[in-house]
C-alpha cells in the first residue's frame, strides 16, 4: 500500500500536480471491525458481560438474564468504559471512542493531509481513536512534508 501511495505521489509530482505550499489536514473517526461486547479488562481478562454480572449480583439479583444486564447497563449511573482498563483482544489497537452520532464503539482515527492548491492527498495516517487532533496533527504534517520532500 505504501509503495502504491509513493508511486501516485511521484506521478503527481511529474505532472506538476503538487504545489506543496499550503496543506490542509482533516480527520474523522471510523468504527473498527471489532465488537464492544468482546472487550475484556486489561488487568484480569474479565469480559464486560462478567463485569456487569458481578455488579448486578452485588446490586440486586443473583442470576441476571441478558435482558436484565442490558437494562442495568443502560441505567447505570457514572458508567465509564476506559481505554486504560479495557481492550478488545481480537483488535487491541482499536480504541473505545464516542462516534459523531453519540454512540460508543471501538474505532480508529484516519487523518489525511491535502495539497490545498491541487487537492492531492499528500499524507494518509491511521491513529488511535482516543488521540485528539492536537496529539496527531504534527505527526501528520511531518509525514506530509517528508512525502513531499521525497518526490520533489
Regions found by a protein language model. Give the residues of each.
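Polybasic low-complexity intrinsically disordered regions
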Residues: 1-152
Amino acid at each position: 500500500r505504501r509503495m502504491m501511495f509513493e508511486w501516485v505521489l511521484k506521478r503527481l509530482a511529474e505532472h506538476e500536480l503538487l504545489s506543496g505550499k499550503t496543506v490542509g489536514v482533516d480527520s474523522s473517526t471510523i468504527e473498527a471491525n471489532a465488537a464492544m461486547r468482546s472487550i475484556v479488562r486489561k488487568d484480569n481478562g474479565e469480559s464486560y458481560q462478567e463485569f456487569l454480572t458481578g455488579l448486578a449480583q452485588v446490586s440486586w439479583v443473583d442470576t441476571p438474564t441478558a435482558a436484565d444486564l442490558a437494562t442495568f447497563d443502560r441505567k447505570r449511573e457514572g458508567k465509564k468504559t476506559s481505554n486504560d482498563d479495557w481492550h478488545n483482544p481480537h483488535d487491541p489497537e482499536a480504541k473505545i471512542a464516542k462516534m459523531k452520532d453519540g454512540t460508543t464503539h471501538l474505532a480508529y482515527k484516519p487523518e489525511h493531509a491535502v495539497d490545498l492548491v491541487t487537492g492531492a492527498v499528500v499524507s494518509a495516517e491511521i491513529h488511535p481513536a482516543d488521540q485528539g487532533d492536537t496529539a496527531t496533527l504534527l505527526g501528520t504534517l511531518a509525514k506530509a512534508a517528508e512525502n513531499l520532500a521525497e518526490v520533489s
